[in-house]
Amino acid sequence: MLPAKPTVTVAWMKERGKLLNNTVVTTVMSNFGLYKAFDEQGIGYAKTAVGDKYVYEYMAKNGCRIGGEQSGHIIFSKYASTGDGILTSLKMMEVMLAKKKPMSELAAPLKIYPQVLENVRVTDKKAAQNDEAVQAAVKNVAEALGDTGRILVR
C-alpha cells in the first residue's frame, strides 16, 4: 500500500488531526519501508488481504480515513470507496501547496526497500503452504532477515 508520495498525505492528515484512529490500512504486499516510516512517525497501520475490496471493508468497519495498495490505489473513505487517482493527486497537491515544497522534498525521507515478487505455480496451494519443508524454509528466511526484511508466502 501507499507508494512514497501518498504517504506524505498520511503524515499531513495526522498533523491536522484528520487521521481517524491514527491508522492507515495497507495490504500484506506493502513495502517494508512504509511500515518503518509509519513506526517512526507514530502512525498505526492495519494489514489486509490484497484488493481494494478488503482495504475498504476494513476501513468501513474500523473508521479509518485512508488506505490503499502498493499498486497506487489509494482510498480516501470520506470521498470514495475505491482508489481514485485524481483524488489522490489532488490530496498530494493540497499538501505541496500548504507546505510550499515539491513532492520530491516531501517524500525524500521515506526509504523504499527492494522487493522481489516470485510467482511459483503449485497444483495444491494449501498443501504447499502447509508443507513442513516449505514452512521451515520460510521460517529460516524470516529469521535470517530479522527486522531488515520479510518474506510473504500466499
Residue ranges of model-derived segments:
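Cysteine protease catalytic core and zymogen-processing segment of caspase-like enzymes
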Residues: M1-M13
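Phosphate-binding and adjacent anionic-ligand microenvironments
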Residues: R16-R154
